[in-house]
Amino acid sequence: MRNPEERMDPWREALECYKSITSDIVIVGQDLEQEFKWDDLGKMFQEGFDKSEGDWVINLSIDMLLHETDIDKLIKLIKLYPDEPAIALPKYKFFEPERYQIKSFETVILNKKKYKNILFNGGGDLALPTLENVVLNQSTVKHLDVPVWNYDTTFRTKEIIAQD
């Protein structure tokens, strides 16, 4: 988390959401420089994965939430796929309260119990998870019908967005 208060990220809401899923919450990114660099993203995700202690790692940024009514469904569905290395969820990206798009499927759930060697070094920004040098993206992993809600710029002022 890099200056979530200043950036007007919904960090309190996100942490409450994560607490409803697990007690193993890993926060990374506090030491990042103010100026964002894309190559920091994969390193930060890897640090979070490495520090996580659970069988499954749910890799969500501080502006991404799961709806409280979907938590039980998600946990039940994950248990159906113990041999999958990763699972993708549809990402609904909000720009404003009434303006959003279904952006893509995000590979955010990773099976650390069976696949400890997952690395975040894939894709153009070197932040996508890989297994044996194969990117674990929407074309290679299982999809679940439980959306991730991304509130990217929803609560930010135009000035904050311009700085970011």
Question: Where would I find each of the regions flagged by the language model?
Answer:
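Active-site-proximal specificity loops/subdomain of glycosyltransferases
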Residues: 1-59, 70
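Catalytic-site signature of metal-activated, phosphate-bearing donor transferases
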Residues: 39-46, 65-164
